[in-house]
Amino acid sequence: MTDNELVAKAKEALEYSYSPYSHFAVGAALLSTDGQVFTGCNIENSSFGATNCAERTAIFKAVSEGVKDFKAIAIVCSGDQPAYPCGICRQVMSEFFNPDTRIIVEEGGGLKTYTMSEILT
């Protein structure tokens, strides 16, 4: 799967975002090493601590189905700024991603790719 195809899957997931409080929709598409794609969106709650980010939704969906090896994740948002993983997502990602797992975001009209080790430094 190409990066553009993975981003397209993330954009599909963004459409399911439940974000009535922030109005900031996020979608993610997670590519496993065996080629499966798991999507997720952000799901807000009036108790903000109960909110789940798109990245964690996709990761938890994959892990709950027995998949724990990943190649890449694409993250998109409804705003003009790139959607970078928050601290909690980075912590969860560090549990399941290898240092070379790719994180793909839309930035400046194109795609920017980071590795897991790059976003942790």
Outline where the language-model segments fall.
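Short solvent-exposed loop/turn micro-motifs enriched in small/polar/acidic residues
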Residues: 21-23
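Short acidic-glycine loop/turn motifs at beta-strand connectors
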Residues: 32-34, 107-108
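Short beta-strand scaffold segments in enzyme catalytic cores
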Residues: 25-32
